[in-house]
Amino acid sequence: MKPAKTPLKNVTIPKLERTFNKCLVWFYAFPTTKIGLTDLAVSINSSKTATKEVVESLIQEQFLNREIIGKAWLLSSNQKHSFFSTKKIPYNLQNVYESGIIEAVYKNTPSPRAIILFGSYRWGTDLAESDIDIAVEVIDNHDLQIVPLGVIQRLGYRKNVPVNLHIFSRNKIEKNLFVNIANGIVLDGFLEVRV
């Protein structure tokens, strides 16, 4: 008969919820990266026990894929999972508001009519190297200008995320680009869309 296993520490619900959210956020930041269970636990600053429990639930949910190599797990995200739109987009939007981007736009661009989040960060398809694209409509009659707003030193688990402003006036923007912007999320102001 095998000796009884030493009982493991209990993992409380709040700890699991924090680990669950940290795990999601890590894979939002690095959706194409494969990582082992131990490295993931270290990266999200969580116990291996709690991380394993959360990872197993995310595998059942089909948010994560698991390759077993010997005794090790290699984890990757399923980028087609609904969490990348239902949970990642609101997470990205919260990050934009908390990062001070809107305030920085007002300091750099006098009297914008509308400030719009568009591109991959808006759709939740951003990768580890992606920048954040912000469209700013102005009343002037100038051609499109793309200018760097700055770099967010830390955005979740990502570091040094560039933010670019696409400053445009209605009369001088290419139609397909305007359609892309119009399908973005208006962060502040009012974007009038004409048919």
Positions of predicted regions on the chain:
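Catalytic core of pol beta-like nucleotidyltransferases
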Residues: 2-111, 123-129, 138-195
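Short, well-ordered beta-strand segments
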Residues: 133-135
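Short helix-loop-helix/strand-helix junction enriched in hydrophobic and basic residues
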Residues: 114-121
